[in-house]
A protein has these predicted regions:
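Glycine-rich FAD pyrophosphate-binding loop
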Residues: 21-45
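Glycine-rich active-site loop/strand segments that organize a redox cofactor
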Residues: 47-95
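Short hydrophobic core segments
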Residues: 5-7, 30, 132, 152-168, ...
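A glycine-rich dinucleotide-binding beta-alpha-beta segment and adjacent secondary-structure elements
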Residues: 127-129, 134, 306-386
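An anion/pyrophosphate-binding glycine-rich loop and adjacent beta-alpha core
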Residues: 34-42, 50, 56-57, 186-191, ...
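Glycine-rich loop(s) and the adjacent beta-strand/alpha-helix scaffold that form part
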Residues: 157-203
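Feature captures the FAD/FMN-dependent oxidoreductase FAD-binding
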Residues: 75-157
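N-terminal Rossmann-like FAD-binding beta1-loop-alpha1 element of flavoenzymes
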Residues: 3-29, 404-408
C-alpha cells in the first residue's frame, strides 16, 4: 500500500483518487478551492456533458492533440466504464444529440455529488482550501508536497491533476505547469481552445445574437483548408461563436499566432450553386416589382438578409426583375461563401479548455508516470492533450485519471 497525494479535485483528480483508493492505497485529495469540481460545475452550461457515447474510433477521431498517447488510458477506462461508474454511483444519465451524455437531472452538481459520495465511501481523505506550492523530491523520486501555509505532507506517489489555464476563476491558474517545470518537465506552448473568435468585419457585430443552423463553416490559411464542418454558429459583439466556431478554434489557434485566417460560411449547403440560382430566379419572377432590399427575407433571417443586401453591392432599391445574371451569380457566390477574416481567439476566460501542457513524450503512456521523476503522475488537462466539444475532453480527464489510479504501486 502506498501513501498517495492527489493535487487537484477536478474530474481527473477525483477519478485518480477514487481508483487509487479502490486499489488499496491511502489517498489524500488536496483541493485549493472551497469545494470539489468547481470547473466541472460550469461545464456544459451547468449541465455537465460527462462523456460521449460514440464508439471509441469516433472518440479518437475527435482528439486534436496526441491521440496515440491515449490508447492505454482509453483501454483502462472507456466511455462506457465512466457511464457505468456514475450510474452505479446513483446518478442516472441520458444520451442526447451527437451522443453527448448528461445527467438526467441536467445538473452538474449531481455528478460532483456522485463522485464525492464515491470518494468518501472508498476512504479518500478530502482536504479543501489547501493550496500546494511545491512538490518535494528525494533522490529523483516524489516524496511529498509543500503547502501555502508552510506545512509539508509526505507521500510515496504524487498525482498532479491541476488542470490547464481556462476559466482561471475556478482555480486553473497554471500552478501545475509551474510545478512540472520545477521538476524538469517541458510545458509546450499553451493557447486558449474551444473558444470564440474575433473577426475583422463590422457586419458581424450588426448581427449580434443571431444564430445560424445547418450551415457549413470553413477556415483556410491561404488555399490550405484547416477546418470544415456542418452545424450551428452564432454572431456576437466581437465576432463569432457557437459549436462550429469553438471546434474550429482548436484546429486554428496555433496558426493565428502568425497571421489572420480566412473563413467562409455556406448559408445554404443543401443547395448547389445552380439550385440556389434557380431558387432566386423563381423568387424574383414571382414578385417582379419588389425592391431587392425586401426580396431576400424568404431566404434568410431579416437581420442577415439586410446585411447580404449591403454586402452584395446591388442597389437595394433596384426592382428584382432588373437584376442581371452577373449580379445574381455574385449573390449566389456570397450566399455559398460568405467571407470573414479571423483576427484572433478570445482569452482563457472564455475558453473551455487549454491547448498545450506537459509534454507527453516525458510521460509513460501506459501508466501516466513521469519519465523524469519516479512516483510522479499526471492526469487531465494539465497534459498536452485536448479534443473537440461533445464530452470528449471530460473523457480524457476520466481516462487519464483512472489509468493513474490503476498504475500506482
Amino acid at each position: 500500500m502506498s501513501k498517495v497525494i492527489v493535487i487537484g479535485g477536478g474530474a481527473a483528480g477525483m477519478m485518480a483518487a477514487l481508483k487509487a483508493a479502490e486499489n488499496g492505497h491511502e489517498v489524500t485529495l488536496l483541493e485549493k478551492n472551497e469545494k470539489l469540481g468547481k470547473k466541472l460545475f460550469i461545464t456544459g452550461k451547468g449541465r455537465c456533458n460527462v462523456t460521449n457515447a460514440s464508439d471509441m474510433e469516433t472518440i479518437m477521431s475527435q482528439i486534436v492533440t496526441n491521440p496515440r498517447f491515449l490508447y492505454s488510458a482509453f483501454s483502462d477506462c472507456s466511455n462506457t466504464d465512466v457511464m457505468e461508474l456514475i450510474e452505479n454511483g446513483g446518478c442516472p444519465l441520458k444520451i442526447e444529440r451527437g451522443q453527448r451524455v448528461f445527467p438526467e437531472s441536467d445538473k452538474s452538481s449531481d455528478i460532483i455529488s456522485c463522485f464525492s459520495r464515491l470518494l468518501k465511501k472508498s476512504g479518500v481523505e478530502i482536504i479543501l482550501n489547501k493550496e500546494v506550492t511545491h512538490i518535494i523530491t528525494e533522490e529523483g523520486r516524489a516524496a511529498g508536497v509543500s503547502l501555502s501555509d508552510g506545512k509539508k505532507i509526505s507521500a510515496d506517489a504524487i498525482v498532479l491533476a491541476t488542470g490547464g489555464l481556462s476559466y482561471a476563476s475556478t482555480g486553473s491558474t497554471g500552478d501545475g505547469h509551474r510545478m512540472a517545470r520545477e521538476l524538469g518537465h517541458t510545458v509546450t506552448p499553451c493557447f486558449p481552445a474551444l473558444v470564440p473568435v474575433n473577426t475583422k468585419e463590422d457586419w458581424c457585430r450588426a448581427l449580434q445574437g443571431l444564430s445560424l443552423k445547418n450551415v457549413t463553416f470553413t477556415v483556410k490559411d491561404g488555399k490550405k483548408k484547416l477546418y470544415e464542418d456542418f452545424g450551428e454558429m452564432l454572431f456576437t459583439h466581437f465576432g463569432i461563436s457557437g459549436p462550429l466556431v469553438l471546434s474550429a478554434s482548436s484546429k486554428i489557434v496555433k496558426k493565428l499566432d502568425k497571421n489572420q485566417l480566412s473563413a467562409f460560411i455556406d448559408l445554404k449547403p443543401a443547395l448547389t450553386d445552380e439550385q440556389l440560382d434557380a431558387r432566386l430566379l423563381r423568387d424574383f419572377s414571382q414578385e417582379k416589382n419588389k425592391q431587392f432590399k425586401n426580396a431576400l427575407n424568404g431566404l434568410f433571417p431579416a437581420k442577415l438578409a439586410e446585411q447580404i443586401v449591403i454586402l452584395s453591392g446591388i442597389n437595394p432599391d433596384k426592382e428584382v426583375n432588373a437584376i442581371t445574371k452577373e449580379e445574381r451569380a455574385h449573390l449566389v457566390s456570397l450566399t455559398k461563401n460568405l467571407p470573414l477574416t479571423i483576427l484572433s481567439v478570445r482569452s482563457y476566460n472564455e475558453a473551455i479548455i487549454t491547448q498545450g501542457g506537459v509534454k507527453v513524450q516525458e510521460v509513460q503512456p501506459k501508466t501516466m508516470e513521469s519519465k523524469l521523476v519516479q512516483g510522479l503522475y499526471f492526469a487531465g488537462e494539465l497534459l498536452d492533450i485536448d479534443a473537440l466539444t461533445g464530452g470528449y475532453n471530460l473523457q480524457l480527464a476520466w481516462s487519464t485519471g483512472s489509468l493513474v489510479g490503476d498504475s500506482i504501486v
